Amino acid sequence: MISIYAQIASFSAIGVGIAIGVAACGGGIGMGIAANATILGMARNPSISSKLTTTMYISLAMIEAQVIYALVIVFILLYANPLLTETIAAAAK
């Protein structure tokens, strides 16, 4: 019989893998769409390419920030899992 501690740890590991995978795929798709729109805008109006490039870099940074937030949550679930600490505290009572 698997202990509740091991079950929480294993489910957390599975959730972490899914979370970072979805975040990375979503970020990659979003960055591709942003770059595509910028290139199309530059092709239509080359005179504003510097403004479009600046706006694209800001957009890419915001998209990447969401992936980094997901990575922070992943590290919290892996190394400082609040579910495990609550389980240990409940078992000690």
From Swiss-Prot:
The record marks E64 as: Reversibly protonated during proton transport. One of its GO terms (molecular function) is lipid binding. The chain crosses the membrane at residues 13-33, 58-78. It is a multi-pass membrane protein. It is found in: Cell inner membrane. Its main location: membrane. InterPro entries: ATP_synth_csu_bac/chlpt, ATP_synth_F0_csu, ATP_synth_F0_csu_DDCD_BS, ATP_synth_F0_csu_sf, ATPase_proteolipid_c-like_dom, F/V-ATP_Csub_sf. Keywords: ATP synthesis, Cell inner membrane, Cell membrane, CF(0), Hydrogen ion transport, Ion transport, Lipid-binding, Membrane, Transmembrane, Transmembrane helix, Transport. Pfam families: ATP-synt_C. GO terms for cellular component: plasma membrane; proton-transporting ATP synthase complex; proton-transporting two-sector ATPase complex, proton-transporting domain. F-type ATPases have 2 components, F(1) - the catalytic core - and F(0) - the membrane proton channel. F(1) has five subunits: alpha(3), beta(3), gamma(1), delta(1), epsilon(1). F(0) has three main subunits: a(1), b(2) and c(10-14). The alpha and beta chains form an alternating ring which encloses part of the gamma chain. F(1) is attached to F(0) by a central stalk formed by the gamma and epsilon chains, while a peripheral stalk is formed by the delta and b chains. F(1)F(0) ATP synthase produces ATP from ADP in the presence of a proton or sodium gradient. F-type ATPases consist of two structural domains, F(1) containing the extramembraneous catalytic core and F(0) containing the membrane proton channel, linked together by a central stalk and a peripheral stalk. During catalysis, ATP synthesis in the catalytic domain of F(1) is coupled via a rotary mechanism of the central stalk subunits to proton translocation. Key component of the F(0) channel; it plays a direct role in translocation across the membrane. A homomeric c-ring of between 10-14 subunits forms the central stalk rotor element with the F(1) delta and epsilon subunits. HAMAP family: ATP_synth_c_bact. Belongs to the ATPase C chain family. This is ATP synthase subunit c. It comes from Campylobacter hominis (strain ATCC BAA-381 / DSM 21671 / CCUG 45161 / LMG 19568 / NCTC 13146 / CH001A). The lineage of its organism: Bacteria, Pseudomonadati, Campylobacterota, Epsilonproteobacteria, Campylobacterales.
